């Protein structure tokens, strides 16, 4: 699935099942929450902490949650993620680490 297809898929899902998008500020808060959940799994999987009994720890699901909400924000604010990714990939935008 391309980023363009993902943006369309999320938009169709929101309009069909979600009724409408949450406000941009609410979605920013939700994105922060999802990143926190991802960070918890990373800390317990690769860091010094351990999982608590019964704690959810599907890394892929959490990454997908982060991407979903990021796509929601892009859709709401009119950002084409494909073009934005191409833009930041230009040599003048990113300096390779030597």
Cite the ranges covered by each PLM segment.
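Flexible "arm" and connector segments at domain edges
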Residues: 1-63, 67-89
